[in-house]
């Protein structure tokens, strides 16, 4: 009787929405922490001169703080994107095999979604429309691309022939 009147997607899509919403909450928390750390370092190094590069070739001087300020702003934009994507993916449905509520009252969908911290999909078929998921995962790809870019830059700056940044080594640390 637990499944009576429902389609599997009513359960699975609604569950996926909860998982993605919670995942976004955790990622946002970590991104806020990262953003704040980058901001702190940007101010700390706002007057530290470094060489600006164009296609890896020395171009003009800039400050390390400016480089970090660029990362800060990009992270702020990524946070905005992820918050929007979190809101757009947080939709559930309990509307039956083809979304017509033929075997379940629409008030059930509203009640369940509210209890789960979701919004009812305004219109659906058997599934919550996948553009919501596509937007969410595209946003994650943008965030991951930024993090990859930051990590690659740090790795480049630590190269022996560049050595403009260095990992802190504690006594006895290897590697």
Regions from the PLM with identified roles:
Residues 1-95, 101, 105-111, 120, ...:
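A helix-coil-helix interface module used to build multimeric assemblies
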Residues 4-7, 113, 123, 147, ...:
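Generic secretory/membrane-interface signal
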Residues 40, 44-47, 88, 121-122, ...:
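Intrinsically disordered or highly flexible coil/loop and linker segments, enriched in small
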Residues 78, 82, 126-175:
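Glycine-rich anion/phosphate-binding loop at the beta-strand->alpha-helix junction
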Residues 111-127:
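A short, charged helix-loop
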């Amino acid at each position: 009787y637990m499944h009576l009147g429902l389609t599997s997607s009513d359960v699975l899509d609604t569950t996926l929405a909860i998982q993605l919403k919670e995942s976004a909450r955790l990622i946002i928390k970590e991104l806020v922490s990262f953003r704040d750390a980058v901001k702190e370092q940007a101010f700390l190094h706002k007057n530290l001169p470094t060489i600006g590069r164009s296609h890896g070739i020395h171009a003009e001087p800039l400050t390390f703080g400016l480089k970090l300020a660029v990362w800060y702003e990009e992270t702020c934009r990524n946070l905005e994107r992820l918050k929007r994507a979190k809101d757009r993916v947080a939709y559930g449905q309990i509307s039956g095999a083809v979304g017509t509520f033929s075997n379940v009252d629409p008030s059930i969908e509203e009640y369940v979604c509210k209890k789960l911290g979701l919004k009812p999909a305004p219109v659906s078929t058997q599934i919550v429309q996948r553009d919501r998921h596509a937007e969410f995962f595209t946003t994650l790809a943008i965030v991951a691309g930024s993090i990859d870019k930051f990590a690659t830059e740090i790795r480049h700056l630590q190269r022996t022939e560049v050595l403009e940044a260095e990992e802190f080594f504690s006594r006895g640390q290897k590697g």
